[in-house]
């Protein structure tokens, strides 16, 4: 009978995990002899007794299919408690685990190669470590993708807020433009040739629009400053967090994975290359083949590990492909959002340019308003001066009118005064002649005599004035002598002159009333601030010329009246020269 090798495989879940050794336990194990009495010695950290079952009759497949063996296991009747055996041992020990039986038939179980090798060398890192690194890289990549998605959503929200703010700013600018056009219309209306059309409502509208424009300009400045700060923050954030960094990390992870796979040669044909030949090669002794047959079965069990790792690698590759697709889609979305941000920046640049233009126009309007305010102040000052001049002229005209009215009852007094002056002159001349003949020619005495004569003349005038006036009023007789006729003519001329002066005074009073009305109207216009500087200057020039003409008339009128009155009185009251017809009469 031929000797048959019997191996013990655990009847537990380790029978399915025999080909998957735990991570870090990748070394060549030794066979442990079976203790007598079925008590197993501790090996590989396992101390519990387990029930085992024996199998025999392992049949290999053809030699050209070394990795896809089908196990044809038959359960034996022997059931014992044995220790855990390393089924992948290279140098087996037949003292504790092998049992031989005699059989008349040929050898039923040919052995695999003498030295089956594991797919990983002892000094190489474990596939689990590489897969854990790949999984951690994938987790980090997914986390970075989620963070990038969150950041892109935040960027989209910022872009939407910026677009809404830009739309609001454009609406505000459109409104400002309309208000600026209205303001220009008001300014053109203010500069128009019809100042009487301007009312107080227009000025109030202009002031309200100017104040609203100031407030809205300040709001626009604040909004533009906030937008600039937000854009700077977004640019810094986008510069700090870009998808290129994520792509670089993914490429580095792929390079590491490919380098690890290429270095360890993970492929379906790798375990085959590690074998020296198919099972049943005639170069090996029968004992060796018999012992290594069960070891080849263990190699088949351990061959399930690379298949599982291949599935994990396929999962990793599919995950990497999905990650690449997501990164490419994110990059495309990022480029679209970057274009939207560039468009928003361009719109903001145009908005800033339009805002600068509007601010320039606003500054020019402010300067023009300041100039108009200064012109209004000057116009108010000149109007106040004009009002004072008009008031003074009104006072002078009133005094002139009172004086002219007082000239009416003076006519008979002047007539009687002329007569009395003639009589007094005659008497004074006679007295002076007598004094000169008596005293002789002395200048001092002559001057004293003149003083005495003037004093006496005043006294005589005061004494004789009232009875003469009464007599003239009572009699009213026409003069008969030529001197009286001349005096009467002069008195009539004086009456005509007084009447003409009265008419002129009435005309002057009417013109003064008109000037007062115009001054009041100009003052009201100045108070309402509706006139342009050119109109104010023209009005002031016109009023100044008018006031100058009025002053000239007023200055000439009292002088003419006084000189006329005095001239008439002197001419009418002067005594005729000696030798004249009046003196002879």
From Swiss-Prot:
Post-translational modification: Phosphorylated on serine residue(s) by STK22A/TSSK1 and STK22B/TSSK2.
Disordered, as annotated region: 91-125, 264-312, 559-585
Subcellular location: Cytoplasm, Cytoskeleton, Microtubule organizing center, Centrosome, Centriole; Cytoplasmic vesicle, Secretory vesicle, Acrosome
Transmembrane segments: none
Gene Ontology MF terms in the entry: protein kinase binding
Any Pfam family the entry gives: TSKS
Positions where Phosphoserine occurs in the chain: 224, 281, 309
GO cellular component annotations of the record: acrosomal vesicle; centriole
Tissue distribution: Testis specific.
Role noted for this protein: May play a role in testicular physiology, most probably in the process of spermatogenesis or spermatid development.
Protein name per Swiss-Prot or TrEMBL: Testis-specific serine kinase substrate
Species, as recorded: Mus musculus (Mouse)
């Amino acid at each position: 009978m031929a000797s048959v090798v019997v191996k013990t495989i655990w009847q537990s879940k380790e029978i399915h995990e025999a080909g998957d050794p735990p991570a870090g336990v990748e070394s060549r194990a030794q066979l442990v002899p079976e203790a007598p009495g079925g008590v197993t010695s501790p090996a590989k950290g396992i101390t519990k007794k387990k029930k085992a079952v024996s199998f025999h009759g392992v049949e290999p497949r053809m030699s050209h299919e070394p990795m896809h063996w089908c196990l044809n296991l038959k359960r034996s009747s022997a059931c014992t408690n044995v220790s855990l055996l390393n089924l992948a041992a290279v140098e087996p020990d037949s003292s504790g685990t092998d049992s031989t039986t005699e059989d008349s038939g040929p050898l039923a179980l040919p052995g695999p190669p003498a030295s089956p090798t594991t797919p990983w060398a002892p000094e190489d890192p474990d596939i689990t470590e590489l897969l854990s690194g790949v999984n951690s890289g994938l987790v980090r990549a997914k986390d970075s993708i989620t963070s990038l998605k969150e950041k892109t959503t935040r960027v989209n929200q910022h872009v939407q807020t910026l677009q809404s703010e830009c739309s609001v700013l454009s609406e505000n600018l459109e409104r400002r433009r309309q208000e600026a056009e209205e303001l220009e219309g008001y300014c053109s209306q203010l500069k128009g040739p019809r100042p009487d059309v301007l009312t107080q409502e227009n000025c109030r509208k202009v002031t309200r629009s100017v104040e609203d424009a100031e407030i809205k300009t300040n709001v626009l400045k604040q909004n533009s400053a906030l937008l600039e700060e937000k854009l700077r923050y977004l640019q810094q954030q986008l510069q700090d967090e870009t998808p290129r960094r994520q792509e670089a990390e993914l490429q580095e992870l792929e390079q590491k994975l490919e380098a690890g796979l290429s270095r360890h040669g993970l492929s379906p044909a790798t375990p085959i290359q590690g074998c020296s030949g198919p099972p049943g090669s005639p170069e090996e002794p029968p004992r060796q083949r018999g012992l290594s047959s069960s070891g080849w079965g263990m190699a088949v069990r351990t061959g399930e590990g690379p298949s599982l790792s291949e599935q994990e690698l396929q999962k990793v590759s599919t995950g990497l492909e999905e990650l690449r697709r997501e990164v490419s889609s994110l990059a495309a979305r990022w480029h679209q959002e970057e274009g939207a941000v560039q468009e928003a920046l361009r719109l903001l640049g145009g908005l800033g340019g339009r805002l600068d233009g509007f601010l320039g126009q606003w500054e020019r309007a402010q300067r023009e308003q300041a100039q108009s305010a200064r012109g209004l102040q000057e116009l108010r000052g000149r109007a106040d001066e004009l009002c004072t001049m008009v008031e003074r002229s009104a006072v002078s005209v009133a005094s002139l009118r009172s004086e002219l009215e007082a000239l009416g009852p003076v006519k008979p007094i002047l007539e009687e005064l002329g007569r009395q002056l003639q009589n007094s002159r005659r008497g004074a001349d006679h007295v002076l002649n007598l004094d000169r003949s008596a005293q002789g020619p002395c200048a001092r005495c002559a001057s004293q005599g003149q003083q005495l004569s003037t004093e006496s003349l005043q006294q005589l005038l005061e004494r004789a004035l009232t009875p003469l006036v009464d007599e003239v009023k009572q009699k009213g007789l026409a003069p008969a002598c030529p001197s009286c006729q001349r005096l009467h003519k002069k008195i009539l001329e004086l009456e005509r002159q007084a009447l003409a002066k009265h008419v002129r005074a009435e005309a002057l009073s009417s013109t003064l009333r008109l000037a007062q009305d115009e001054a009041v109207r100009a003052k009201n216009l100045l108070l309402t601030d509706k006139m342009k500087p050119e109109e104010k200057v023209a009005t002031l020039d016109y009023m100044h010329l008018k006031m100058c003409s009025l002053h000239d008339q007023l200055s000439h009128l009292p002088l003419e009246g006084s000189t006329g009155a005095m001239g008439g009185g002197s001419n009418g009251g002067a005594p005729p020269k000696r030798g004249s017809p009046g003196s002879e009469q």
